[in-house]
Amino acid sequence: VYFHQNMLIYEYQSTDWRITMKAYERLLKYVTFRTPSDENSETTPSSACQFELARFLKNEMEGLNLSDIVLDDMCYLYGKLPATTGYENIPAIGFIAHMDTVSDYCNHDITPVITENFNGVSLTLPAGITLSVHEFPHLGTLKGRTLITSDGSTILGADDKAGIAEILTMIEHLQKDNIPHGTICVAFTPDEEIGMGAEHFNIEQFGAKYAYTIDGDTEGEIQYENFNACKADFHIKGFNVHPGSAKDTMINASLVAMEINNALPAMETPRGTEDYEGFYHLVSMSGDVSEASLNYI
């Protein structure tokens, strides 16, 4: 299973009837929980709704017989699958995923759409949005696969609820197939989308020697570095007077904001950069004559 914000590509390999829930079935349940994080909040978690999913996952982890399950007051959820006999002394390995979703696109009333035997060329969603190979070349490799998307009017939330689904399905698979393993540590965190997912992460409670974050896209890919950015906010105060008598007096805050943005290198934006090249990304802007703001990462 791998995923983008609006698309989950799914191919289930196991035919073991003992597995109670497949990963995609868990994902379809998890996306019914609305969990956007809020970058303007000063609390942890930044949105109380993340606790609703956390409590649901805690109950599921109890049903999977995990031990040392802890949901702390900052919405970090931890648990362990004890080592099988003879594997108690090997290093514990951990798996991490985050519960929050982005807040800058519609994230409620999500309607998943399952498309079987994808044609490998384009996919038109019920809301009228078309995903094409021209815009997303990787789609060409998915011919014949089953895709799970939103209906195009919302996000799907596969980032990172698909990661949660994969981890708990793996836990179930290890137990029901009696696969030998060392201690498996699990953690589900809040507020990753606003850069705060690790802020209150309790490494001691987690307990892993090594760990993987299950949050990516290309199938089989392992990333050993992570995205890193800083935030820059400009707040501009203008001077507003009647435009009929404004000569040499008015300072239009919106025009000043435009000047600031135009002073930045035109090609040093996400569209014009790659790999380790830095960029200035104008996330949002607002303004009038009296006040204006620019928000960058």
Regions found by a protein language model. Name each.
Residues 57, 166-174, 257-261:
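Buried hydrophobic packing segments
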Residues 53, 159-166, 253-256:
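Catalytic-loop motifs flanking and including active-site residues across diverse enzymes
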